UniProtKB/Swiss-Prot annotation:
Residues 97-105, 167-177, 257-263 are lumenal. One of its GO terms (biological process) is zinc ion import into synaptic vesicle. It is found in: Cytoplasmic vesicle, Secretory vesicle, Synaptic vesicle membrane; Synapse, Synaptosome; Late endosome membrane; Lysosome membrane. This is Probable proton-coupled zinc antiporter SLC30A3. The gene is Slc30a3. GO terms for cellular component: cytoplasm; glutamatergic synapse; hippocampal mossy fiber; hippocampal mossy fiber to CA3 synapse; late endosome; late endosome membrane; lysosomal membrane; microvesicle. It comes from Rattus norvegicus (Rat). GO terms for molecular function: antiporter activity; metal ion binding; zinc ion transmembrane transporter activity.
Length: 388
């Protein structure tokens, strides 16, 4: 295994087949990128990936966090403070109003605090350097934090749905409509503030050094869509669900304030908007489970990556192409490239790496270069995987 620089400052690893090193008759001889070749390269089209930079150049702050992760940490800290203050107010207001809907909102805020604290811990853990055991570092801890955030909300919501169902069956409860209206109004303001804090409009992305995280490419578009840190995304979805519920609670409190006989609006609003909160977290849960199952990122399809590699001059075939992700924004690829015996392996490696980084935003690529053999066309292990 030999390191090879690639454009964009991302990490690239070159694997050279031993049989290609020792092939008789002048087999593949890899020319060093750091010394002048003994003889000039043959004339041919200039490859766009021939300009290199050192493979470990990146933009990481002294604290070990990339700018995007440092921003995510600040957002989560601010949201935690706002969430705790207004959660305490909702607990008091819900107790005074005897409102299950208000207590439901407070419970969701409590779940948000717990999930954001878990996200902050996972952000800290992800800055730890890679080890010989954890060779990719601790990036996956961010995904686990997002999973814990979603699961905690589902558990709390399930309990509150059960309590709301009991209130629909039994009407022996009283609600202080004035206290409920005031608390619901404050809750709406609190969730709007948290949504503003967590909203990531114009989060930076980079087409240069890969210290900045690439967000998944939006399906059908050619530019990366910056979703920011996974934990902030999960927290933002939480807050959106809470905001919808708070608006529903506010509407119910207005109705109960003017029409006390319609107090059943309290458990009904709890029931309806808890279901909405569950539905709003389903996409995040789906993405997190896909990452944990080592699935290909939803924004990167197999065929375009394969076709990009095959379009490199000198590449005859590709096999063992694998796409996966450590987080929603940290994408990884590996592949074997079978090339012509007369092709320059270094030039092909540079061009293939450059195209993968620039077109798909991979954070890490591992490419193995080997000489093309006719039996590869019939090899069962070299066949493409079937469509899911």
């Amino acid at each position: 295994m030999e390191p090879s620089p690639a454009s964009g400052g991302s990490e690239t690893t070159r694997l050279v087949s031993p049989r290609d090193r020792s092939s008789a008759g002048g087999g593949l001889r890899l020319k060093s990128l750091f010394t002048e070749p003994s003889e000039p390269l043959p004339e041919g089209p200039k490859l766009e990936g021939m300009a290199f930079h050192h493979c470990h150049k990146n933009r990481v702050s002294q604290s070990g966090l990339s700018p995007e992760r440092a921003q995510a940490r600040r957002q989560l800290y601010a949201a935690c403070v706002v969430c705790f203050i207004f959660m305490a107010g909702e607990v008091v207001g819900g107790y005074l109003a005897h409102s299950l809907a208000i207590m439901t909102d407070a419970a969701h805020l409590l779940a948000d605090i717990g999930s954001m604290m878990a996200s902050l811990f996972s952000l800290w853990l992800s800055t730890r350097p890679a080890t010989r055991t954890m060779t990719f570092g601790w990036h996956r801890s961010e995904t686990l934090g997002a999973l814990a955030s979603v699961v905690s909300l589902w558990i709390v919501t399930g309990i509150l749905l059960y309590l709301a169902f009991l209130r629909l069956l039994h009407s022996d409860y009283h609600i202080e409509a004035g206290a409920m209206l005031l608390t619901a109004s404050i809750a709406v303001c609190a969730n709007m503030i948290m949504a503003f804090v967590l909203h990531q409009t114009g989060a930076p992305h980079s087409h240069g050094p890969r210290g900045a995280e690439y967000a998944p490419l939006e399906e059908g578009h050619g530019h990366p869509l910056s979703l920011g840190n996974t934990s902030v995304r999960a927290a933002f979805v939480h807050v959106l669900g809470d905001l919808l519920q708070s608006l529903g609670v506010l509407a119910a409190s207005i109705l109960i304030y003017f029409k006390p006989q319609y107090k059943v609006a309290d458990p009904i609003s709890t029931f309806l908007f808890s279901i909405c909160a569950l539905g709003s977290t389903a996409p995040t849960l789906r993405d997190v489970l896909l990452v944990l199952m080592e699935g290909a990122p939803r924004s990167v399809e197999f065929e375009p990556v394969r076709d990009t590699l095959l379009s490199v001059p000198g590449v005859r075939a590709t096999h063992d192409l694998h796409l996966w992700a450590l987080t929603l924004t940290y994408h990884v690829a590996s592949a074997h490239l079978a090339i012509d015996s007369t092709a320059d392996p270094e030039a092909i490696l540079a061009e293939a790496s450059s195209r993968l980084y620039s077109r798909f935003g991979f954070s890490s690529c591992t490419l193995q270069v080997e000489k093309y053999r006719s039996e590869m066309a019939h090899c069962l292990r070299c066949r493409e995987p079937p469509k899911a």
